[in-house]
Amino acid sequence: MNFTDSHCHLDFDAFSNERPQLISQCASANIHQIIIPATHPANWQTVLNLASKENYHGCNLFACLGIHPWFLEGLTIAHLDDLARAVEQSTGPSIENKSKKIIAIGEAGIDGGIAKQQDNLNQQIMFFNYQLALAKQYQLPVIVHHRQSHHYIIPLLKKAKLTAGGVIHAFSGSYQQAKEYIDLGFKLGVGGTITYPRAKKTINTISRLP
């Protein structure tokens, strides 16, 4: 059986000295597809460069482009315009090497844990909505970050009416919230939290899903 890692930040500097070895280990464990979400304009090109390598150490790497809510400080609407251009350039029919095409928008989302001030929350919502609009325009899935923010994210996803769904990264939440995401066409990413005995709500939720 072959597996896909739906969320791996292989582009981060922490992996620079051991990236080939890590990818080879993934291939040895039958993980042959790895999706790399971007987090900030500064790492878009690194993500695209990694995804351009075909069958890299036994794995196919796939790129996503987006802006993570943790990294909004100093960013403006101009950076969203840059994202729109980068997405257009990475999805156009003129691209000869299909591996250079992005497969999703993200990582995008809302983090209630850092939204201590209304201005920050408003910025997060603006950036998230913009990226949802890009996903709808290009019929791409969205890789969604959440923390203490289902009550913001679910209504925005309902309003966006996306056609390609996406993945709710490292889902933790109630059964009702999980069902709402699934009904919107999203998959739930399950991280290491599911192995923690204290994560009773998430364990119960996942066990009840089809």
Where are these regions (language model features)?
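Mid-domain alpha/beta scaffold segments of enzyme catalytic cores
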Residues: 1-210
